[in-house]
């Protein structure tokens, strides 16, 4: 294996106009002896940045995959916008922009890994874009139900102008009026709306649930998968996990292993998980995680300095 264990991801910027951009990180394959058919795109969950998935990117790269991560617009991370302006449609636009950008670079064979709220976005578009396969983990299938469980109240039953604007979801201000208005106007809220979008999916598909997930009902995931057209589909359980896949190192390692096994299997057009993968050691994971955090901080400081220069130039 090539000695690239501690190399940083390649930093790309997709210019979408109006001084707005999507930041993308590319991790090259670190096992050049294993040839994979697909590039993996990781869509981070709500309030998760792409550097939060450094470990998963390392697992996949060590098993021969090129890995693409990105931060959504109007979200936490390095792309344009603030999370209080986030909506599901903005997340959809961000994902589609990244997919289009890859295809413009002649990267056409793409497998998508999406977790939590981003999985609902993946379900929205996966049947309409040219993916090789789809993997979801603790994927939201009934957005209204998940929000009610997470927020302890069904705010979507209220008139939009009466919903508190400062709802905190996953430690961040949801920007509830923007988010809820988009949910209703674009039919993001119900299980039926999710099934209507994903039912024509005809590519290999693996969904992972967690047996301790209080936010996503496993029977609803099973109902969704049963309605998917593809004859290559399967559900697996992340035993011992909750909705938080990073709650401890045991759960996190199981998540990395499971996603990587699924990616290797689906790259071969199989839904039965492979038995063996190459695992990076703990020291390498620690170093790359720290290095990516430093890269994130460096880019954030550069962004702040550019904004300050613009303000000074306008005075």
Curated annotation (Swiss-Prot):
Pathway assignment: Lipid metabolism; fatty acid reduction for biolumincescence
GO molecular function list: acyltransferase activity, transferring groups other than amino-acyl groups
Keywords: Acyltransferase, Luminescence, Transferase
Source domain of life: Bacteria
Record EC number: 2.3.1.-
Active site: 116 (charge relay system), 213 (charge relay system), 243 (charge relay system)
Protein's UniProt keywords contain Acyltransferase: yes
Pfam family, one: Acyl_transf_2
One biological process term in Gene Ontology: fatty acid metabolic process
Keyword GTP-binding in record: no
EC main group: transferase
Role summary: Acyl transferase is part of the fatty acid reductase system required for aldehyde biosynthesis; it produces fatty acids for the luminescent reaction.
Record-stated family: Belongs to the LuxD family.
Protein name, entry field: Acyl transferase
Organism of this sequence: Photobacterium leiognathi
Lineage, uppermost ranks: Bacteria, Pseudomonadati, Pseudomonadota, Gammaproteobacteria, Vibrionales
């Amino acid at each position: 294996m090539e000695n690239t264990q501690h190399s940083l991801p390649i930093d790309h910027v997709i210019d979408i106009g109006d001084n707005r951009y999507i930041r993308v990180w590319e991790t090259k394959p670190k096992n050049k002896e294993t040839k994979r058919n697909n590039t993996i795109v990781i869509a981070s969950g709500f309030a998760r940045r792409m550097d939060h998935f450094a470990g998963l990117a390392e697992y996949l790269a060590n098993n021969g995959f090129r890995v693409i991560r990105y931060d959504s617009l109007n979200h936490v991370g390095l792309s344009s916008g603030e999370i209080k302006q986030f909506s599901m449609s903005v997340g959809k636009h961000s994902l589609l922009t990244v997919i289009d950008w890859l295809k413009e670079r002649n990267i056409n064979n793409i497998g998508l890994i999406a977790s939590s709220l981003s999985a609902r976005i993946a379900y929205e578009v996966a049947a309409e874009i040219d993916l090789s396969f789809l993997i979801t983990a603790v994927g939201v299938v009934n957005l209204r139900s998940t929000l009610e469980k997470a927020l302890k109240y069904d705010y979507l039953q209220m008139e939009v102008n009466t919903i508190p604007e400062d709802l905190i979801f996953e430690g961040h201000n949801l920007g509830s009026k923007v988010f809820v208005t988009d949910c209703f106007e674009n039919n993001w809220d119900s299980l039926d709306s999710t099934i209507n979008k994903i039912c024509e999916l005809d590519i290999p598909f693996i969904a992972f649930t967690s047996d301790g997930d209080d936010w996503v009902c496993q029977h609803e995931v099973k109902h969704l998968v049963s309605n998917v057209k593809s004859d290559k589909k399967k559900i697996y359980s992340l035993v011992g996990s909750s909705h938080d896949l990073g709650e401890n190192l045991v759960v996190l390692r199981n998540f990395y292993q499971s996603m990587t096994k699924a990616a290797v299997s689906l790259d071969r057009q199989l839904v039965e998980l492979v038995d063996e993968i190459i695992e990076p050691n703990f020291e390498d994971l620690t170093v790359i995680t720290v290095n990516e955090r430093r890269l994130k901080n460096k880019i954030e400081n550069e962004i702040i300095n550019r904004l300050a220069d613009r303000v000074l130039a306008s005075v």
